[in-house]
Structure formats: C-alpha cells, structure tokens
C-alpha cells in the first residue's frame, strides 16, 4: 500500500497456500507506531528494539494487527484478491491474530 491516510479502509491477510486463504479481517489504518509488546515475529521485535514505526491496523473485530505481521492493503484490493483465490478453489479461513501469534510461538 503506497499512499495511506489515517482512516483508510484496509484488509489484512495472514497468508495463503495452495489450499487456503487466511484472512485476519477488514478495518482501518490508524497510523504509524512502534509495535506493542503483543505484536509477534522477528520484525516486530526489531521495530521495538530500534524504536521503528510500523503500520497499525484496527480491525472491525477489535483486533490490532501490525503491518509487519501480515499482508495488507486497501480493502477493495484485498477483497478482490481473496475472491480471485477463492474462485480458484482455495478455502477462506478467518483467523484471529491472537491465535496466530500463539501458534507462531510454538
């Protein structure tokens, strides 16, 4: 996502493989901040250590997801991408970021 404005609608994907598309959800871009302690992954930790900001996304389901934890973009683009993948036979799976973070710790 290139130009972004606080309040822009966004979509966030955890990932996709040959069988599934893992959707974190849709929400809004809330700005650039240093990821909080709950953000998972090596890049999130690096951002905290180096005090580097990262895109913060507030999803409609209440979850806060950081750009470094997912693939994200404008809502209409993500919806179109998901539709293309599902149209090719992939199964759509909704994932909560807390569950993904726990699974990544294992």
Language-model segments: residues:
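Short beta-strand-centered aromatic/proline hotspots
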Residues: 19-39
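Non-transmembrane, membrane-adjacent beta-strand/coil modules in membrane-associated proteins
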Residues: 38-49
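Short, well-ordered loop/turn sites that connect or cap secondary structure elements
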Residues: 4-6
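Intrinsically disordered, low-complexity, charged/polar segments
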Residues: 47-106
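Beta-strand elements of modular eukaryotic interaction domains
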Residues: 1, 18, 45-47
